[in-house]
Curated annotation (Swiss-Prot):
The keyword Flavoprotein does not apply. It is found in: Cytoplasm. Keywords: Amino-acid biosynthesis, Cytoplasm, NADP, Oxidoreductase, Proline biosynthesis. This is Gamma-glutamyl phosphate reductase. GO terms for cellular component: cytoplasm. Catalyzes the NADPH-dependent reduction of L-glutamate 5-phosphate into L-glutamate 5-semialdehyde and phosphate. The product spontaneously undergoes cyclization to form 1-pyrroline-5-carboxylate. It comes from Streptococcus pneumoniae (strain ATCC 700669 / Spain 23F-1). One of its GO terms (molecular function) is glutamate-5-semialdehyde dehydrogenase activity. One of its GO terms (biological process) is L-proline biosynthetic process. It catalyses: L-glutamate 5-semialdehyde + phosphate + NADP(+) = L-glutamyl 5-phosphate + NADPH + H(+). Its EC number is 1.2.1.41.
Length: 420
């Protein structure tokens, strides 16, 4: 096993091969990575079967689905890499140019961060997405996968590095930490001088640990306590469609709805319909029904478990939905501000003034009017695959694509000027 220190030194030694690579060279490397990923399908699936067998009974079915790979999912991962090829190279982009009175020409241009560390849980597609985005944005990457997905991740990284071996980019620009203990995560948090940026992707425990302990710069990809508010002026059919999509299409992802707020004028009509759609209809279709966590007012209209205070602060990542009835738009916004993780929140309304109030007052990375929160995604936003959803305001916010993985520098050109 290569030590963490050796890996940090290896990636530092080769980072220039990617930091200054041309767009053509990077695109050739990405295509080679995608091709080798597909070529290694058999090996990746064998590794994934080991991870799935070890995880069965230890994590929920929803989380098992995150971990699971088949040939179609591997092809989708390769397609995601190829889509990054089509994106414009951000490196070298001139952001601003100005000329001073003394003749100095100052150019602000986009540059790579250097080496980016990613700590993430059991999602194999993060491995290929992170490798593709960091490479196209001119960065080397150190990956630290969750233990549940390690065999799969190792097989994926092996394939990606074999792809790089056919190019002029050194394969060591992609590093996988072999130690999946907590100590390896903490070592990355303290790797000042080796990592220029650290991005955690996972649950609240992981993200909080990184934010609280890291001495290297961190972008917080926050958990998603995502709200949908059904206003008194909502179109109910539209609301039901949005709720269904936001909750059931993929409940294990961070942009899935966890809390439903319903105006009291709509509760009696929409909640029974919601119960029919999310419970009875799903049972009849052989699908897992939604389990409700209901406040006292909501429980008058549908059956479910009484909500506890913590239910409105929980990212369930499962077929569970907390429901609260509110008396006004202002109460809905106040609730969101008290409980939101500032990821994605939505209002369903036909009232333009209510929509404007909601979008002005709700301080989240993505705020929706009459649309599902499931659109908070780099691919859906036209950014290609994403590194995560930032819930902070510095240095990036919302879905992080290529530009969010870069910095800038000033190039100052003169003709012998000196400062008086």
């Amino acid at each position: 096993m290569v030590s963490r220190q050796e890996q940090f030194e290896q990636v530092q030694a080769v980072k220039k091969s990617i930091n200054t690579a041309s767009e053509e060279v990077k695109n050739q490397a990405l295509l080679a990575m995608a091709d080798h990923l597909v070529a290694a399908t058999e090996e990746i699936l064998a590794a994934n079967a080991l991870d799935m067998a070890a995880a069965k009974g230890k994590i929920s079915d929803v989380m098992l689905d995150r971990l699971y790979l088949d040939a179609d999912r591997i092809e989708a991962m390769a397609r995601g890499i190829r889509e990054v090829v089509a994106l414009p190279d951000p490196i070298g982009e001139v952001l601003e140019t100005s000329q001073l009175e003394n003749g100095l020409v100052i150019t602000k241009k986009r540059v790579a961060m250097g080496v980016i560390g990613i700590i993430y849980e059991s999602r194999p597609n993060v491995t290929s997405d992170a490798a593709a985005l960091t490479l196209k944005s001119g960065n080397a990457v150190v990956l630290r996968s969750g233990k549940d997905a390690y065999q799969t991740t190792h097989a994926i990284v092996t394939a990606l590095k074999k792809g790089l071996e056919t190019t002029t980019i050194h394969p060591n620009v992609i590093q996988l930490v072999e130690d999946t203990s907590r100590e390896s995560s903490y070592a990355m948090m303290k790797a000042k001088g080796y990592l220029d940026l650290l991005i955690p992707r996972g649950g609240a425990g992981l993200i909080n640990a990184v934010v609280e302990n890291a001495i290297v710069p961190v972008i917080e990809t926050g958990t998603g306590i995502v709200h949908v508010y059904v206003d008194k002026d909502a179109d109910e059919d539209k609301a039901l469609s949005i709720i269904n999509n936001a909750k059931t299409s993929r409940p294990s992802v961070c942009n899935a709805m966890e809390v439903l707020l319903v105006h009291e004028n709509k509760a009696a009509s929409i909640l029974p319909r919601l119960d029919q759609m999310l419970v009875a209809d799903r049972k009849e279709a052989g699908l897992e029904p939604i389990q409700f966590r209901l406040d006292s007012k909501a429980s008058q209209f549908v059956s479910g478990q009484a909500a506890q205070a913590q239910d409105f602060d929980t990212e369930f990542l499962d077929y569970i939905l907390a429901v609260k009835v509110v008396s006004s738009l202002e109460e809905a916004v106040a609730h969101i501000e008290s409980h939101s993780t500032h990821h994605s929140d939505a209002i369903v309304t036909e009232n333009a003034e209510a929509a404007a109030y909601f979008t002005d007052q709700v301080d989240s990375a993505a705020v929706y009017v009459n649309a599902s929160t499931r659109f908070t995604d780099g691919g859906q936003f036209g950014l290609g695959c994403e590194m995560g959803i930032s819930t902070q305001k510095l240095h990036a916010r919302g879905p992080m694509g290529l530009k969010e993985l870069t910095s800038y520098k000033y190039v100052v050109a003169g003709d012998g000027q000196i400062r008086e």
